[in-house]
Every structure is written in structure tokens, then in C-alpha cells.
Amino acid sequence: MVSIRAPIIARCCAPAPQEISHRTMKKTLMIAFTLAAGTLTPALAQDAKAGADKVAMCVGCHGIPGYQASFPEIHKVPMIAGQGAKYIVSALTAYRRGERKHPTMRSIAGSMSDQDMADVAAYYEVQGKAAAAGAAPTPAPAVAELLKKGACASCHGENLSKPIDPSYPKLAGQHADYLFVALKAYQTDKNPHVGRSNPVMMGMARPFTQVELKALSAYIASMPGDLRTVSQARFR
């Protein structure tokens, strides 16, 4: 889901995560961006054409429609075609650093140079759907409350498909079981084998029950979006 590498903002006297309003969340994120600005390194030039020659390690899973992974539980691998390039680089970097715990992805990310990541990310960014079809379905009242509770649109943008920062993922249309597993991972802390380390997403995910996360994931998966699976046959 979201990858933010800004310094952790002091939480003294801060409201509980479930009480954070959309306005407060946006203000918090803007402060984080400002604090981090001095530590950011220049982005590498991205070459989508070069990336097309580097995706062999990706298509074995992400190029097969409906392909399932088994770690940490069975779920469809995420659709990455159409995802933002900066987010893809951010996610790969998190796997390489161990901030996202996944043995296969850490091995793959560890074998990639920064330039490889930039090129592969650029390639997948331009492989999304030409246009999202139709409007998002109206959520059930209970789901609408969950979306409000999580302040999802505050970061992931309109229809959860236009993130306010390119390092955040597009969510609309993503596989429900993947979203559920990813959200649960943010509830897992200080485990050397599973989980994801991200201060903002950890704070947002923890107040939800698994039943609520499943309902939220199912609705987000039903939303039209840019993401898709580019068939492996495309690369032969």
C-alpha cells in the first residue's frame, strides 16, 4: 500500500488514528514531506523502453492473470501495470530494505540496481488501462463509514485512483485478497518474518478488525481503476 519515508512525526497529545480527520491527515502529510525534502536524493532518469527488457523477473508472477502467491497466505499477486512509477520504485526499495517482509520480493529487489528499478517502474506505469470505465459504485453505509474512518481518499485521491503524491499507490480495482493481506501486514509490528513498516499506514490500519478490512478491500476492488495484468504472452 503506501510507502512514506519521512521522519516519524512526534505523536505526543495526538488524536487516536480513528479520530484523525481528512484535514488533519493532509496537514500531517504535508509536514512530513517538508521535513523529508532535505533528505531526498535526485530521481534517476527512467527509461520505459529499457524497462521492457528487464521485466523477465516480473512476468512470471505479475504477468499471469489470477496468479496466486502463498506468502504469508494465499492471495492473488497485485496488478502493477498502470501503477505509478514512483510508487513501484518505493515499494521495491521497501522490499530491498526489509521494510516490507517478503522473501521472494526481497531477493528480486535485492538483485536490482536503482536504475533497474527506475526503468521497470517506468515500463509498468505506461501499461495501464486506457481509461477507467464508469463511476465507482456507491458503497454500503457501513463501508462508507470505513472509508471515512480510514481517510483513504486523503492520500489515495479521487476514486482511490489519483494519489496526492506519486509515491502512493493507486488502489481502485486492485485484487481484494491482496489488499486484505497488505492491510493486515501493516497491523503486524516487530515481526522479523512478516509485516510492513510504515508509520502512517500502521496507524491507519490498526483500528480495523479483519472483518472490516475484508469489507473495505472488497469495495475498493469493485471500483474501476487504471490497474491491470499485462499477459505474459505479451513479452514473447
What do the predicted segments below correspond to?
Residues 32-39:
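Bacterial N-terminal signal peptides
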Residues 110-132, 177, 204-232:
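C-terminal capping alpha-helices of c-type cytochrome domains
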Residues 40-45:
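Sec/Tat signal peptide C-region and signal peptidase I cleavage site
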Residues 23-31:
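Bacterial N-terminal signal peptides that target proteins for export
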Residues 65-96, 106-111, 145, 153, ...:
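Gly/Gly-Pro-rich "capping" loops immediately C-terminal to redox-active cysteine motifs
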